[in-house]
Amino acid sequence: MAAQSGAAHVLDLSAAPCLRVAYSLLGKHNMTSPHLFNLEILKYPRTPHLRGSRLQVGDQADAVPYEALAGRHIVVEEKLDGANAALSFGADGSLLLQSRGHYLQADQMGGRERQFNAYKQWARAHEGALMALLDERYVMYGEWLYAKHSLYYDALPHWFCEFDIWDRVAQQFLDTPQRHALLSGVPVVSVPVLYAGISPRRMQDLLALLAPSLGRSARWKAVFEDQVQRQKLDLPLAWRQTDRSELAEGLYIKVEENGQTVERYKFVRSDFVQVILESGSHHSERPIVANGLRTGVDIFANAIQKSW
């Protein structure tokens, strides 16, 4: 049975303080328990756009001016095009997997959660190491990139790319150096960092970081076409649902102070948004086209290459 989206109590970390989650209701591996849908879930904060992002009608009403970053320490990451996911553990050691506002059925494959099959298998394979690291203290958020959305990747270092960690004890998001240090001993890849330092004086200097995606090879278009044809899918339709640009989706910008991430913003290419608007369907309604991993990547290995 697919997880019941919206049935769990959602704690939006951007809108309210985090409360201690009553995870003890779940038994070990009992991911089909009805209690699963009654647990409070720590939903990743909504991220505002920087002014100039998207550039669709009405988009600038809630956008933040670049001046808000003036003189502040920022970390700029490539914004990846995947599914927001998270991994944590309950007080009794229960493995908890989530996708945005709902929990996943960790031991059930297929159905509406089919794009997360490999995520569930990967989490189970590394459950011991992740439990020893995260325990019930940390919630690890990441981008799950198995299924193509609008960008196709053919050279990813992993399908799960971590981008934030919430500390339930300190009630804050760790900054980038702490996250990387915490994850140094486990086979978890983090999203690529493009810049860290005081924000550039001009927005155009920030936007100069928007370059070809690090998750693609020079042959990604040919690889994509080969895969679509192997799956016997409609190639012209597949291209209409795919961004042809060589560039990444956009930039993700974090403001980090005193060991924590205190603000976050995003900048998304307007032509990327246009592809979504003109595709005629949502990615969840299409056949899955799996993004490719870099040659030699084994997501189940105990040691992996973390670089991009």
Residue positions per predicted region:
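Core nucleotide-handling region used for phosphoryl-transfer chemistry
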Residues: 30-308
